């Protein structure tokens, strides 16, 4: 941003940044008006700043002393020529000045006493002891064209001068910091220690230039260990390192050297950054120019350079009359009262410079209308100034967005800005309402415990009800009902519903409001109309079984389309668990047209009431056959409450051959079942097993006859034929010349099976023989055992029944012999083993009673007894 030399004092008009898009690093303020008596009526040639005062020296030899607030304390005319340099002590009580008239004058600001040192030669620089006011030595350094650095001090007999360095050419600049002094002369930079009273070292200029006295030396002490030097187009950083050895001099060294593209008119440190006042010109412009020719100057730039020598910013400063100024006419001085403040001073202007702080950052963001960032930055401030209160910034921010038509964005930021101020929050809602943009703020209304008044939410719901039924329904489900009056919104919704009952969205909204207003029956009928799963939940939660009794089919349809499997099972369970409200006859009648529902109902009913609803046996067969073949077969096997003909018809309909075989078997159509196994299932092994299970000789004959023209079947029969009789029958019927595959293997297996059977029978015979004898003996003993009687001890008694006396106390075991029909003693009974062995009836009967009555075991026992009798 370019400015004219006579522009106003405002920051914007005075400063031009090198990058307009970036936030400035420094802030500027022209304060020339505070010192009008000096800058308007005179031209400044020298200056100094203390914690309390500004000191200005003019080309007319006058010295001005101002307070920081711009009040002129004193004007002193002490010199007859231009004041070249000023230096003030730390207490701001004593001021040293030097002039081209060769005089150095020390002035006491409070007492107005002055001490004059006349060196008879033009002086260029002066430096007063920082602790001049507290030390009795009263030391001041000066130097100039005489080529000497002179230390003037107060001695026992008066003032005395001590030459610290002679024959050094012109002395351009002297700077005193605590116990260190640095001066710049034609020989370079010399560093002196007042503690040791010795020169620590000298740095020669990196290069020699013609007319090098044109370029002012800049000396700035950042600390006792660092000195920053500016000269020509170079910036040097010098390090002073104290020794750990006693009485050893500190060592100085050049730490860094930076060359810039302009002339250094001032340099100092702002924190860890270098602040330099750059005179925009090439060094060669001054070293090669004709002495009488004056170079027109450009606006100087104030540049901030970091520790890695990267330029952070560069701002051109539009000082008054800058085109007629030379590099030595500018001064860059730090403010002793603040490390972040400094001043740029020219003969006719003064600009206050400081680093931008957080408040400046916020103001910059506001100026760029970056309100969101500004508000975030304000929240981090330890103290918020009145002009930057969040409420004010928030108001500006929202009006800024509204002015740009960004209502949605404005509604989005309001919650974060007014979360703790619900009254202001609510006012913004009405602002949106006035501009017909309620929908842009509705999504951001608070819905928790800290919420707005019900009127706000009802107003927005009414707006949506009139313009957007879908969003109205969405808000009803999103917002807690505590935010608004449910009855009020329900009545408004019901009124519109009566006008348009075809709207599913409006129906859902009204059902929701009925439910929230504790009217579940009305809500149920509306949800049922919408085919919503919620109607099933309402039945279960509010016991609306009587209301649902006539709508079973519709409820089943709703549950079948539901996404949740729990809803489907819940519906079937409800119908079964509440049979008093849902009689099975009515349920079956309603859902009869949908076999899937019948299947689910029958399955659920069977779980709770096994072997029930037998009157619907044929209907169960229909649905089980369609949806669950395993359950269909289980039902065929485990129940009898169905028509066999109907079952056979279903099996044929669905081509359930295994089930059809079972049904044909139950119907007595064994031959048809056998043919089904052979012709349809093509399973000769199963056919053989089926014939064995039926134990029907005619079936064997049919199977053998059917297999005679099928060599593969013949071989399979030979391997699994079983009894000798069937095997003989099969072998005898095989047509001569029939070629049988792997016949040898089949015959070998047949013979091996026959041999195994013979061995089995023989083993069983041996086992049963011994067991038969043992059982026969035991049976004989049981049959011949008698009862114990008491008889009198009378020799005339015999063993007749009529002669027994039960009062006799002697116990004598008696056995009644069936053969002789008499009672005998046990010891007189002789068991003849051979007789027992020959008693076939007893052995056979007792063995039969001892064995398990399985069919196969009975057959084997018959075979065993047959073989036994033949032996």
UniProtKB/Swiss-Prot annotation:
One of its GO terms (biological process) is macroautophagy. Residues 1-23 are annotated as: Disordered. It comes from the Eukaryota. GO terms for cellular component: cytoplasm; cytosol; HOPS complex; late endosome. The keyword GTP-binding does not apply. InterPro entries: Clathrin_H-chain/VPS_repeat, TPR-like_helical_dom_sf, VPS41, Vps41/Vps8, WD40/YVTN_repeat-like_dom_sf, WD40_repeat_dom_sf. Pfam families: Beta-prop_Vps41, TPR_Vps41. The keyword Lipid metabolism does not apply. WD repeats lie at residues 39-76, 78-117, 119-162, 166-204. PROSITE patterns: CHCR. Keywords: Protein transport, Repeat, Transport, WD repeat. SUPFAM superfamilies: WD40 repeat-like. CHCR repeats lie at residues 575-716. Required for vacuolar assembly and vacuolar traffic. PANTHER family: VACUOLAR PROTEIN SORTING VPS41, VACUOLAR PROTEIN SORTING-ASSOCIATED PROTEIN 41 HOMOLOG. Belongs to the VPS41 family. This is Vacuolar protein sorting-associated protein 41. It comes from Schizosaccharomyces pombe (strain 972 / ATCC 24843). The lineage of its organism: Eukaryota, Fungi, Dikarya, Ascomycota, Taphrinomycotina. The gene is vps41.
């Amino acid at each position: 941003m370019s400015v004219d030399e006579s522009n106003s004092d405002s920051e914007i008009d005075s400063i031009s940044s090198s990058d307009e898009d970036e936030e400035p690093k420094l802030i500027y303020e022209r304060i020339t008006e505070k010192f009008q008596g000096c800058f308007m009526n005179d031209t400044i040639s020298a200056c100094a700043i203390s914690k309390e005062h500004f000191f200005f020296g003019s080309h007319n030899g006058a010295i001005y002393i101002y307070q920081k607030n711009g009040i002129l304390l004193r004007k002193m005319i002490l010199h007859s020529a231009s004041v070249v340099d000023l230096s003030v002590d730390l207490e701001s009580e004593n001021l040293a000045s030097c002039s081209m008239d060769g005089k150095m004058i020390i002035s006491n600001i409070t007492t107005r006493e002055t001490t004059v040192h006349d060196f008879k030669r033009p002086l260029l620089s002066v430096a007063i002891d920082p602790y001049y006011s507290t030390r009795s030595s009263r030391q001041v350094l000066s130097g100039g064209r005489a080529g000497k650095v002179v230390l003037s001090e107060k001695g026992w007999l008066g003032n005395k001068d001590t030459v610290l360095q002679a024959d050094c050419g012109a002395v351009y600049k002297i700077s005193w910091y605590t116990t260190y002094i640095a001066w710049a002369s034609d020989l370079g930079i010399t560093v002196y220690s007042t503690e040791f009273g010795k020169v620590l070292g000298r740095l020669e200029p990196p290069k020699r230039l013609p007319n090098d006295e044109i370029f002012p030396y800049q000396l700035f002490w950042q600390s006792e260990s660092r000195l920053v030097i500016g000269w020509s187009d170079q910036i040097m950083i010098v390090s002073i390192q104290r020794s750990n050895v006693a009485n050893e001099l500190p060592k100085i060294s050049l730490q860094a050297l930076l060359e810039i593209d302009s002339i250094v008119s001032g340099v100092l440190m702002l924190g860890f950054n270098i602040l330099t006042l750059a005179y925009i010109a090439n060094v060669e412009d001054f070293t090669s120019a004709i002495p009488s020719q004056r170079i027109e100057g450009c606006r100087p730039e104030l540049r901030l350079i970091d520790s890695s020598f990267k330029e952070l910013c560069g701002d051109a400063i539009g000082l008054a009359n800058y085109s007629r100024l030379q590099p030595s006419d500018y001064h860059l001085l730090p403010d002793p009262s603040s490390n972040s403040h400094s001043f740029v001073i020219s003969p006719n202007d003064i600009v206050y410079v400081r680093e931008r702080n957080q408040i400046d950052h916020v103001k910059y963001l506001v100026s760029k209308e970056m309100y969101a960032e500004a508000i975030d930055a304000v929240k981090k401030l330890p103290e918020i100034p009145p002009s930057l209160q969040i409420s004010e910034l928030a108001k500006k921010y929202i009006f800024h967005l509204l002015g740009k038509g960004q209502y949605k964005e404005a509604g989005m930021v309001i919650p974060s800005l007014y979360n703790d101020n619900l009254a202001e929050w609510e006012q913004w809602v009405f602002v949106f309402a006035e501009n017909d943009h309620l929908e842009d703020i509705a999504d951001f209304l608070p819905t928790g415990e800290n919420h707005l008044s019900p009127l706000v939410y009802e107003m927005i719901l009414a707006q949506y009800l009139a313009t957007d039924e879908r969003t109205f329904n969405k808000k009803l489900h999103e917002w807690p009902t505590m935010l608004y009056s449910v009855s009020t919104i329900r009545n408004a919704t019901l009124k519109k519903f009566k006008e348009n009952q075809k709207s599913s969205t409006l129906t859902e909204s009204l059902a929701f409001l009925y439910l929230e207003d504790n009217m579940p029956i009305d809500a149920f009928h509306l949800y049922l109309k919408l085919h919503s799963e919620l109607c099933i939940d309402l039945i279960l939660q509010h016991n609306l079984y009587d209301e649902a009794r006539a709508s079973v089919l519709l409820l089943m349809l709703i549950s079948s389309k539901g996404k949740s499997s729990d809803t489907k099972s819940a519906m079937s369970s409800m119908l079964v668990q509440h049979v008093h409200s849902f009689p099975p006859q009515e349920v079956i009648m309603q859902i009869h047209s949908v076999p899937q529902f019948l299947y689910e109902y029958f399955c659920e009913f069977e779980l709770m009431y096994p072997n029930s609803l037998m009157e619907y046996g044929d209907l169960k067969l229909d649905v089980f056959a369609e949806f669950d073949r395993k359950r269909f077969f289980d039902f065929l096997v485990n129940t009898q409450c169905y028509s066999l003909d109907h079952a056979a018809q279903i099996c044929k309909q669905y081509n359930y051959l295994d089930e059809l075989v079972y049904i044909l078997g139950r119907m007595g159509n064994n031959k048809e079942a056998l043919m089904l196994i052979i012709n349809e299932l093509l399973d000769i092994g199963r056919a053989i097993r089926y014939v064995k299970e039926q134990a029907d000789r005619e079936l064997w004959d049919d199977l053998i006859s059917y297999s005679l023209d099928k060599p593969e079947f013949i071989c399979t029969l030979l391997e699994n034929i079983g009894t000798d009789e069937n095997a003989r029958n099969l072998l005898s019927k095989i047509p001569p010349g029939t070629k049988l595959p792997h016949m040898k293997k089949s015959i070998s297996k047949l013979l091996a099976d026959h041999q195994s059977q013979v061995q089995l029978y023989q083993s069983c015979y041996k086992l049963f023989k011994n067991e038969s004898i043992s059982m026969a003996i035991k049976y004989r003993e049981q049959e011949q055992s008698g009862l114990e009687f008491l008889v009198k001890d009378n020799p005339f008694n015999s063993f007749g029944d009529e002669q027994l006396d039960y009062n006799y106390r002697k116990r004598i075991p008696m056995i009644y012999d069936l053969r002789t029909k008499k009672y005998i003693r046990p010891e007189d009974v002789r068991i003849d083993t051979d007789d027992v062995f020959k008693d076939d009836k007893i052995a056979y009967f007792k063995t039969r009673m001892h064995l398990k009555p399985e069919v196969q075991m009975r057959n084997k026992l018959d075979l065993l007894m047959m073989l036994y009798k033949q032996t």
